[in-house]
């Protein structure tokens, strides 16, 4: 099998909705969260995730949710994304407990934390993403009668451009501390775009601000994902998504960048570290996945 060229389906000004290109990966992750919610002993329950899948009409994800797997291999990616979801949930809970009242979810996708988490009074949650993605989420949650548990503000913007101005125009206060999440975004950015993203976040972050990042230390290699499915037949990584063609090879280390730009960075953890902290024993398939993805979960403060 020949590995597709990395980023071959991308361009500097490409766009997408929730069922195409990078947007579909948000739907895929929502599917994994929905599967994790119905698995034994879930770390988190995102009951909105299944509504996004139903509304999308995607045949692959609809079929998977209709007949969820039960083996360790079948639950591998739902389990790993359950761990990731818990990490970011805990981050925002801790930020709120510390008195931070501005949360910014970068590349919000189908994130439902504004509706799921128990936010302190007077908290504003800013969700930054492309307009088509935000419109889909608002429509689906509106049809469900969902009510956010904080003041939720949509910021329609391309994260490869200057999104800081739309954020400030939406009411973001640069003089007040903020909590930022960058979840599942970095593989889809070039190195230059990643630097620009962190530069803008740093420029908007008052003293006392915090950031949480989920990153990968290696590229999303098509051959490795295929080999994983061959060696663990229950694993179904992505349906027909070609991650190699949608992502770029990582060059910069986010933790090193933050440390060099005025952030105090906590010890970096991987998925296996998080699982241990949640009292879980990672199955062999999880160890293998993290062996080639080299996950990084980063928290830092100013």
Swiss-Prot record:
* The EC number(s) this enzyme carries: 2.1.1.-
**Which InterPro entries is this protein grouped with?**
Ppm1/Ppm2/Tcmp, SAM-dependent_MTases_sf, SAM_mthyl_Trfase_ML2640-like
UniProt-listed PANTHER family: S-ADENOSYL-L-METHIONINE-DEPENDENT METHYLTRANSFERASE YKTD-RELATED, S-ADENOSYL-L-METHIONINE-DEPENDENT METHYLTRANSFERASES SUPERFAMILY PROTEIN
Q: What is the protein name stated in its UniProt record?
A: Putative S-adenosyl-L-methionine-dependent methyltransferase MAV_2803
Under the heading Pfam families, the entry gives:
LCM
The function of this protein is: Exhibits S-adenosyl-L-methionine-dependent methyltransferase activity.
The cross-references to SUPFAM superfamilies, in alphabetical order and at most eight, read:
S-adenosyl-L-methionine-dependent methyltransferases (SSF53335)
One GO term in the molecular function aspect is: methyltransferase activity
Species the sequence originates in: Mycobacterium avium (strain 104)
Family stated for the protein in its record = Belongs to the UPF0677 family.
> What are the leading ranks of the lineage?
Bacteria, Bacillati, Actinomycetota, Actinomycetes, Mycobacteriales
Q: Do the record's keywords include Phosphoprotein? A: no
Binding of S-adenosyl-L-methionine occurs at 129, 158-159
Choose any GO biological process term that the UniProt entry carries and state it.
Answer: methylation
Q: Which UniProt keywords apply?
A: Methyltransferase, S-adenosyl-L-methionine, Transferase
Question: At the top level of its lineage, which domain of life is listed?
Answer: Bacteria
Keyword DNA damage among UniProt keywords: no
């Amino acid at each position: 099998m020949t590995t597709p060229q990395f980023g071959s389906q991308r361009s500097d000004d490409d766009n997408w909705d929730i069922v195409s290109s990078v947007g579909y990966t948000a739907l895929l992750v929502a599917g994994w969260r929905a599967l994790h919610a119905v698995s034994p002993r879930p770390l988190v329950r995102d009951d909105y995730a299944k509504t996004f899948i139903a509304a999308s009409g995607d045949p692959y994800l609809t079929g998977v949710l209709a007949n969820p797997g039960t083996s360790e291999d079948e639950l591998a990616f739902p389990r790993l994304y359950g761990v990731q979801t818990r990490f970011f949930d805990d981050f925002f809970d801790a930020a709120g407990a510390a008195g931070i009242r501005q949360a910014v979810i970068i590349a919000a996708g189908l994130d439902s934390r504004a509706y799921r988490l128990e936010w302190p009074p007077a908290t504003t949650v800013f969700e930054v993403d492309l307009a088509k993605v935000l419109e889909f989420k608002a429509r689906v949650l509106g049809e469900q009668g969902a009510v956010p548990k904080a003041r939720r503000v949509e910021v329609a913007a391309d994260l490869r451009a200057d999104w800081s101005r739309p954020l400030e125009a939406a009411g973001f206060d640069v003089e007040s501390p903020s909590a930022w999440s960058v979840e599942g975004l970095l593989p889809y950015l070039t190195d230059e775009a990643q630097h620009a993203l962190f530069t803008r976040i740093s420029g908007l972050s008052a003293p006392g601000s915090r950031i949480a990042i989920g990153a990968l230390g290696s590229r999303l290699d098509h051959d490795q994902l295929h080999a994983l499915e061959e060696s663990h037949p229950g694993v179904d990584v992505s349906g027909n998504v070609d991650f190699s063609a949608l992502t770029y090879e990582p060059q910069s280390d986010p933790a090193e960048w933050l440390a060099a730009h005025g952030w105090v960075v906590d010890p970096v953890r991987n998925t296996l570290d998080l699982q241990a902290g949640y009292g879980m024993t990672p199955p062999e398939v999880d160890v293998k996945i993290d062996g080639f993805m080299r996950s990084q979960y980063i928290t830092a403060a100013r």
